[in-house]
């Protein structure tokens, strides 16, 4: 199978205006990925599916990632005058990187028996309803998984045929897979009508009679 560098070059040469970045994965798996620019993501996805050398016709998994705002420290060596002498010292600066959300897709070719190729898209920020293009029109297996990411992370997939919650109820607020999500104090109080159900149950079932001391059954040899 082609390397990611080769795939990147062919995508940018074939899809007008497309920009692809290779994202390195430093974990033991070293499963590097391709970051697609959102404007051309659907066109790139169609190319990956129909290109004869790739034929990535199956999307096995789609997941969301929440990246919080973070501060990165950078160290650089500079020359400065210290006590009248020029010396090389290390200066540390801080760079604030705003948070964002990602959707990551794992692609395989069932026809050519090869893969995976991992692609990802990135929102501009972590705002409620941050948009990304839906890839469900290219891989139908992404439909429910994009709905799950919408439900749990809050990414709005433009072009999705049926974008609505899939695990949480419609009235649920917030997105429980976000890293800054705060769990409510009581899961049973709302929206489960616990008190109403308990009252109906007491009306339906007659209470069990209490046994006095003479009616208790005791074990015998």
PLM feature segments, named:
Residues 1-221:
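Terminal low-complexity/charged segments
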